[in-house]
Amino acid sequence: MFRGRVRHVHFVGIGGVGMSGLAEILRSLEFEVSGSDLKESSTTRRLTSLGVRIDIGHRAENVRGVDVVVYSSAIRPENPELTEARALGTPVIGRAEMLAELMRVKYGVAIAGSHGKTTTTSLVATVLRAAGLDPTVVVGGKMAALGTNARLGAGDLLVAEADESDGSFLRLTPTIAVVTNIDPEHLDHYGTHERIKDAFVEFAARVPFYGLAVLCLDHPHVQDLLPRIPRRHVTYGVSPQSDYSARGIQFRGLETSFNAYRRGEPLGGFTVKMPGAHNVLNCLATIAVADELEVPLDVTKQALATFGGVARRFTVVGSIGGVTMIDDYGHHPAEIRATIDAARRAFPGEDHRVVVAFQPHRHTRTRDLFDEFTRAFNQADVLLVTDIYAAGEPPIPGVTAERLVQSIREHGHHDARFIADKTDLPEALEKIARPGDVVIALGAGDVNACVRGLKARLEAKSPPQEGSS
């Protein structure tokens, strides 16, 4: 790799989920690792426990004496640490370039797509670990089985989530490339949907002549790309035209089962402890990757059946007084619809209402997908919307959460409410929730605190359980 010339790696924005994973991998490889972030978090505390020096706040002196500086897509070019590093002549690289360097010396499996990539990456990693292949894993969420989002493995494989948000995933050179779906997203970078599709074509084309692209046929924008993919590829989906397909899908509470087929050949029944039709697709992508890597079918089945999930992906926070509370990272209209649909399937019947607390993520996304957001919550009985989580972006005139709620009402939703202060959400939810309700916190910011706050409120007023002290 680059050992010898580089001994000390510094991460600007180390608390981010993608950055922290790379930092943990490099620390496991015995590099000296340091980093900075604007605030302390459970992630920074974990890294500190691993021997990573972390400074709170971005200051020029933080990068003096380091060999390379890695920055995330959230860091602005004028950041004082980047400015100082460039002045010192220290190499400054993006996160994707560092991930690409790790992948260069491995057999890379990269999972990209507008949605589902974190879960699919985690599923693939789980199956390959169960097969004894001991992959290195870098994923955009905390895997329950690992207790973290990254792990250095002894095997030749590297399984990574590929972030398409700024186009930097085109630096990766995977041997297997998965594309889960393509939606209008990150238009602040790409400008048009067609340019997004072009980027995914280039991503799939980066696999070598002996590699494989795994593509979701059910998604029309992915299907559009098939004639343009110059490499060997297979498709997956519920469609019978898919190379890897599913039939007989059944939803039983938080569990989903289906029968899988490979070009019409039955592969048997599969079960996963996650609700939602979208997770069937994530499993099919995993089955296709495992098949390419010659993982025995029974190993794949068992690994999927015991998969423990990923943090903030339909995570059940608790169930008190008949109220089930769920934390989900969904922040794009397609993800929102899929999560609400999964809740409807997991908790069917008239006795169950779906109550959603939503925090829009980024002003640009709210602006670019405003019309789609107005129709994304039709299946929610009650909707609470709080202010936009800026993620470092400046406000955009006329783009507000309050205006979004107004538009949602204008488009036919009968119970959409604006809660300006997110700290008021737990109290508002407590007043709304009744036995049988499913309360979902939706968003990529910090809205998940509201369901934990609701849980604390319900616990405080619920009668003590027998045998408790």
Curated annotation (Swiss-Prot):
Which reaction(s) does the protein catalyse, per the Swiss-Prot or TrEMBL entry?
A: UDP-N-acetyl-alpha-D-muramate + L-alanine + ATP = UDP-N-acetyl-alpha-D-muramoyl-L-alanine + ADP + phosphate + H(+)
Which Gene Ontology terms describe the biological processes this protein takes part in? cell division; cell wall organization; peptidoglycan biosynthetic process; regulation of cell shape
Q: In which pathway does it act?
A: Cell wall biogenesis; peptidoglycan biosynthesis
Q: Tell me which domain of life the UniProt entry assigns to the organism this sequence originates from.
A: Bacteria
Query: A single GO molecular function, which one?
Result: ATP binding
* Binding, ATP: G113, S114, H115, G116, K117, T118, T119
Keywords (alphabetical) are: ATP-binding, Cell cycle, Cell division, Cell shape, Cell wall biogenesis/degradation, Cytoplasm, Ligase, Nucleotide-binding, Peptidoglycan synthesis
Q: Which InterPro entries has this protein been placed in? A: Mur-like_cat_sf, Mur_ligase_C, Mur_ligase_C_dom_sf, Mur_ligase_cen, Mur_ligase_N, MurCDEF_pg_biosynth, UDP-N-AcMur_Ala_ligase_MurC
Q: A Pfam family for this UniProt protein? A: Mur_ligase_C
Q: What is its EC number?
A: 6.3.2.8
Q: Which SUPFAM superfamilies does its entry note?
A: MurCD N-terminal domain, MurD-like peptide ligases, catalytic domain, MurD-like peptide ligases, peptide-binding domain
Q: Which GO terms describe its cellular component?
A: cytoplasm
**Where does this one sit in the cell?**
Cytoplasm
* Similarity remark: Belongs to the MurCDEF family.
Q: Which PANTHER family match?
A: UDP-N-ACETYLMURAMATE--L-ALANINE LIGASE (PTHR43445:SF3), UDP-N-ACETYLMURAMATE--L-ALANINE LIGASE-RELATED (PTHR43445)
Q: What does this protein do?
A: Cell wall formation.
Q: What is the designated name of this protein?
A: UDP-N-acetylmuramate--L-alanine ligase
Organism expressing this protein natively: Sorangium cellulosum (strain So ce56) (Polyangium cellulosum (strain So ce56))
Q: Name the gene for this chain.
A: murC
